[in-house]
């Protein structure tokens, strides 16, 4: 977990990046993850704009949960997805990349080694207070670290 706070006008922005334990992890590890994340969320002032992004290793599915998810998630909710939804309910957060209808390739963020299965396990969380500001939320499973780095580094030609 990492966090950065940007000073801005009229609001400061706090961004948290997470990597949640997988379903193979001990249950206690999952509990520690959410406890640590909750502690981290207590640090910035409540008026900050808050983003939490990352690999949640959870499937929230396409079933809408009012105030938390839209109906445009991928697949069927699993236990980790239910835990993520409960965390969002407790903290007034939206799972933004379930709010907008998109092509399936813009939803899935994990592909099985044999290429037969895709899951949506990476999410962008945003405070419910700021719902009207969200215009789009997309993921790109095909974007590699090398592509990201190449786009950030100056051209050396």
Identify the meaning behind each predicted range.
Residues 1-157:
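A shared catalytic/ligand-binding motif for oxyanion handling
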């Amino acid at each position: 977990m990492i966090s950065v706070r940007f000073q801005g006008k009229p609001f400061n922005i706090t961004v948290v990046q997470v990597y949640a334990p997988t379903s193979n992890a001990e249950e206690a590890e999952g509990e520690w993850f959410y406890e640590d994340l909750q502690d981290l969320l207590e640090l910035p002032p409540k008026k900050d704009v808050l983003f939490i992004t990352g690999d949640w290793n959870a499937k929230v599915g396409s079933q809408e949960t009012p105030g938390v998810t839209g109906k445009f998630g991928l697949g069927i909710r699993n236990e980790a997805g239910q835990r993520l939804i409960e965390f969002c309910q407790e903290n007034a957060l939206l799972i933004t990349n379930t709010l907008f209808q998109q092509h399936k390739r813009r939803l899935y963020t994990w592909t099985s080694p044999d290429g037969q299965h895709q899951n949506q396990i990476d999410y962008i969380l945003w405070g419910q207070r700021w719902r009207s500001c969200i215009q789009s939320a997309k993921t790109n499973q095909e974007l590699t670290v090398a592509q990201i780095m190449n786009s950030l580094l100056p051209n050396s030609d």
